[in-house]
Amino acid sequence: MVLTGVTSKAIRKGDAEPPLSKGSFRVYNMRFCPWAERAMLYVAAKGIEAEVVNLNVTDKLEWYWTKHYQGKAPAVEHNGKVVIESGFIPEYLDDAFPETRILPTDPYEKVQQKLLADRLTAVAHAVPLLFAVMRDRTLKDEKQRKVFEVLKQAENLLANDFYAGSQPGYPDYLSFPFFEKIWWSASLDGVVDLPTIEFPGEEEYPKLTKWFQKMISSDVVQSVTQSLEHGAAFMNAYATHQELNYDLGL
């Protein structure tokens, strides 16, 4: 995999659009956004040579509105065409670069993996519960019960080493960023009672713990992810409405 610009500083309102040479592939990213990380993981897993442009999505770029009507990340650009939304980008990438296809070509198997990814969106919905606790620690017991339920459901859905089977695939790459955000939250004092080492816990979630360790240590994830320390700090700042440092850790 060849990703350049992963650790580049975020561009913001007033910055010029970086030139993109013909035939080049670009990912517009926000380093701490789980939705953007979905696209980054998929690009990395497919081994696409890509330039990464990190964005400040608070102080939005004027010209970026022509790429994404909401000014959000992620977006991918290739040969003058822009595709947005983390739920659509993976399928586009599989169709545009079929030689490294991740989703199965068999119609039935493809639908099964998409359904599994859809069921795992419950993990994404758990993240805002932790934002609420970051703002008010008295909500911890109430919110973490719901998080634990979601993790148990995810544990029960894991029938193999990975959600896609013997190797990580579509449901793994689309769900991992949200498990990671729960892991980040676990490192903050008083937010959720989960370990950061052997996350989310071998006793309660043995299959999920092995899965997470395999994912977090993989070359694909390591090529795009942020550290536990910086990720947790950014999450806390976002949840508590502090000024956001999009270049944290650079």
Curated annotation (Swiss-Prot):
Tissue specificity as recorded in UniProt: Expressed in the intestinal cells.
Keyword annotations of the record: Cytoplasm, Oxidoreductase, Transferase
The keyword Transferase is assigned to this record: yes
Catalytic function, reaction form: RX + glutathione = an S-substituted glutathione + a halide anion + H(+); L-dehydroascorbate + 2 glutathione = glutathione disulfide + L-ascorbate; methylarsonate + 2 glutathione + H(+) = methylarsonous acid + glutathione disulfide + H2O
Annotated catalytic residues: C33 (nucleophile)
EC number(s) per entry: 2.5.1.18, 1.8.5.1, 1.20.4.2
Matches recorded under InterPro entries: Glutathione-S-Trfase_C-like (IPR010987), Glutathione-S-Trfase_C_sf (IPR036282), Glutathione_S-Trfase (IPR040079), Glutathione_S-Trfase_N (IPR004045), GST_C (IPR004046), GST_omega (IPR005442), GST_Omega/HSP26 (IPR050983), Thioredoxin-like_sf (IPR036249)
Binding site for glutathione: K60, E85, S86
MF annotations from Gene Ontology: glutathione dehydrogenase (ascorbate) activity; glutathione transferase activity; methylarsonate reductase activity
GO biological process, one term: glutathione metabolic process
Recorded phenotype for the gene knockout or disruption: RNAi-mediated knockdown results in increased sensitivity and reduced survival in response to oxidative stress inducers cumene hydroperoxide, jugalone, paraquat and arsenite, and to heat shock treatment.
Subcellular location: Cytoplasm
Cellular component terms per the entry's GO annotation: cytoplasm
Boundaries of every GST C-terminal domain copy: 106-234
Family, similarity comment: Belongs to the GST superfamily. Omega family.
Known partners and oligomeric status: Homodimer.
Protein name as catalogued: Glutathione transferase omega-1
Species the sequence originates in: Caenorhabditis elegans
Lineage, highest ranks first: Eukaryota, Metazoa, Ecdysozoa, Nematoda, Chromadorea
